[in-house]
């Protein structure tokens, strides 16, 4: 049998240690680690080099400032250069998934240099009702932006394929939406990714900073207190326990938040971070 590619001579890092083997690749996958040198179309001499597993980046935003057919090429190319072999996109749609998901999937499939997956962001009750549709079309994780609502509800959605127009929306990810997303995700056996900030606290903090004419990173940080983060973590963790849902807290930004996560784990919440 002739394989696509054979990489010879490298030190291969595995979960159990470093081994010296040849690596056989076929149809884009590693199919065997061996001492043999089978027939191949391409042979790469990696003598003295180290082969490490590709990095999985589970949290990437692209398709917002350029349409996905352009963004996927540029961002996945950069990912590949940096050793990221799987990237997971936070898809944000301002309209129906039943209406727009198919085009996003089609244009994505023709544009990536590396493996990829998609998290579906849920902003409305109508989109909650489309979570089953997302799963049926291969999207099996969901994102909640607890930071978006009220005076801080503005967000840029992903562009439509073939268009190059920014799509600004105003959303309100309220307690009803959060509860229904967690409940539905649990019933589907899907995890929920969480941006954990309380938008009411953040909105109040930003308003106070503006009233005092404060600006810069320090003002930004003070307007989004760690208590906002820990409060959101506590709120959604209780829901996750009630419905037996798995949570993944993205980009935790404070010691207070991490302490709250540890406390929620002790309470039985299934959490990744």
Predicted regions and their residues:
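Histidine/acidic residue-rich metal-binding segments in metalloenzymes
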Residues: 126-144, 148-273
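Short, surface-exposed connector motifs at secondary-structure boundaries
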Residues: 83-88, 112-116, 239-247
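N-terminal metal-binding scaffold of metallo-dependent hydrolase/deaminase domains
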Residues: 1-39
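Divalent metal-coordination and catalytic microenvironments
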Residues: 10, 28, 48, 59, ...
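Hydrophobic faces of well-ordered beta-strands that scaffold small-molecule active sites
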Residues: 54-60, 87-89, 116-120, 142-144, ...
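Active-site loop-to-helix "anion-binding N-cap" substructures in soluble metabolic enzymes
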Residues: 91-109, 113, 122-126, 144-154
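Active-site mouth loops of central-metabolism enzymes
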Residues: 58-70, 91, 114-126, 167-170, ...
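Metal-associated gating/positioning segment near the N- to mid-region
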Residues: 46-111
């Amino acid at each position: 049998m002739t394989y696509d590619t054979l990489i010879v001579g490298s030190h291969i890092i595995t979960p159990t240690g470093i081994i010296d083997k040849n690596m056989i690749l076929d149809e884009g996958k590693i199919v065997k680690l061996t001492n043999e040198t089978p027939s191949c179309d391409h042979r790469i001499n990696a003598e003295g080099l180290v082969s490490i597993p590709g990095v999985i980046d589970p949290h990437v935003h692209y398709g917002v400032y350029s349409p996905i057919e352009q963004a996927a090429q540029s961002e996945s190319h950069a990912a590949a250069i940096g050793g990221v072999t799987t990237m997971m996109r936070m898809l944000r749609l301002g309209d129906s998934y039943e209406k727009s998901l198919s085009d996003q999937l089609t244009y994505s499939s023709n544009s990536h240099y590396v493996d990829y997956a998609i998290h579906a962001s849920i902003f409305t009750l109508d989109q909650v009702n489309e979570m089953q549709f997302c799963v049926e079309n291969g999207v099996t994780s969901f994102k909640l932006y607890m930071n978006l609502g009220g005076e801080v509800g503005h967000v840029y959605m992903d562009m439509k394929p073939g268009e190059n127009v920014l799509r600004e929306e105003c959303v309100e990810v309220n307690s009803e939406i959060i509860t229904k997303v967690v409940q539905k995700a649990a019933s589907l056996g899907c995890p929920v990714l969480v941006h954990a900030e309380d938008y009411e606290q953040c909105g109040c903090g930003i308003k106070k900073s503006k009233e005092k004419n404060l600006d810069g990173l320090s003002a930004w940080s003070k307007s989004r207190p760690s208590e906002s983060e820990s409060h959101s973590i506590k709120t959604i963790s209780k829901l996750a326990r009630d419905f037996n849902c798995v949570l993944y807290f993205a980009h935790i930004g404070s010691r207070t938040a991490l302490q709250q996560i540890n406390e929620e784990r002790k309470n039985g919440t299934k959490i990744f971070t």
